[in-house]
Design a protein with these regions (language model features):
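Alpha-helical transmembrane segments and their immediate juxtamembrane cytosolic regions
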Residues: 1-298
Length: 298
């Protein structure tokens, strides 16, 4: 985002860039409904409106894009902090952090109703919320936005320090350690919960990403060692395609249809083989796309 939005930052006409932003948001949201929202089931009763990682990315991207376009760096930091604090207030004072007692869960149930993932229908036509589905989405959109902003900040650091790789590595690692430390302190009051994507979880996961980014930046950009890492580029250049393929198409069935004879020899490890074969098939498809320069652009 820091790279692609820089040319639109000072342009008073934000119409063209907003059209691109809305297009990306809609496409990612629809892809999310295809992957997990049961859109292809063509059954309105089992349609889930907001239930997938791609939709979380779409919402986070939309929030972060607006912040990037209309705020300078100082205000970007302030607004990102406000997103975390605004999320925290009702989560702390209007509920607890139990699966059914948290504020974010109540918002999802109230707004989405039977269009929420985890709902099951009874024979009499009534429906109920599942006690085993505890992911939250609507209120957690605030922290999704903060997560994308952390990624944008990492991009700004790398863009600004392209002529000083050592400083980039140091900055990424220091921020990563600081975010993790702060998240652990905050977790004493607000637990680190992935399914709720709490503010502490946002900082913790962001800290890990900064550390990983620093490590890879050190190895590849600073030291110039990229041998053995090309497979990451194959995945990274078509990451959304990889995710959709792996979730929508059951390649395990394809693997089982041609390797069922191995089950008698592998025993309990046969399922492990099928899982490996599933990812192998996806990788081979991505490799062909990479070599043919076919990339899914949103």
């Amino acid at each position: 985002m820091p790279f692609s939005f820089s040319k639109f930052k000072d342009n008073p006409d934000k119409g063209p860039v907003y059209r691109k932003i809305i297009k990306r948001f809609i496409l990612l949201f629809i892809f999310g409904m295809i992957v997990q929202g049961n859109l292809l089931g063509l059954d309105p009763k089992h349609l889930y409106l907001y239930s997938n990682t791609l939709q979380a990315i779409a919402t986070g991207y939309l929030i972060a894009a607006i912040i990037q376009l209309h705020c300078n760096f100082r205000w970007q930091l302030i607004v990102t902090a406000l997103l975390l604090l605004i999320y925290w207030i009702p989560m702390t004072f209007l509920g607890d952090f139990t699966p059914e007692g948290n504020f974010a869960e109540k918002v999802d149930r109230l707004v989405l109703g039977h269009f929420r993932d985890g709902v099951f229908w009874n024979e009499d036509g009534s429906w109920s919320f599942s006690a085993h589905y505890n992911y939250t989405w609507i209120w957690s959109s605030l922290t999704f936005g903060a997560t994308v902003m952390l990624g944008a900040f990492a991009g700004k650091i790398m863009k600004a320090g392209k002529d000083n790789h050592r400083k980039v590595v140091q900055t990424l690692l220091i921020i990563g350690i600081s975010l993790i430390a702060f998240s652990l302190i905050w977790s004493l009051q607000m637990p680190i919960i992935k399914r709720l994507w709490t503010s502490s979880m946002t900082l913790f996961s962001g800290g890990l990403c900064f550390l990983l980014m620093g490590a890879f930046y050190y190895r590849i950009d600073y030291k110039g060692h990229s041998r053995g890492l090309n497979w990451l580029k194959i995945y990274g250049m078509n990451s959304i395609t990889a995710y959709i393929l792996g979730e929508v198409i059951n390649f395990r069935c394809i693997a089982a249809s041609v390797s069922y004879g191995l089950e008698q020899y592998l025993g309990g490890y046969y399922q492990v083989w099928l899982s490996f074969a599933n990812y192998l098939i996806v990788f081979l498809i991505l490799r062909i796309m990479y070599r043919q320069k076919i990339f899914l652009k949103i």
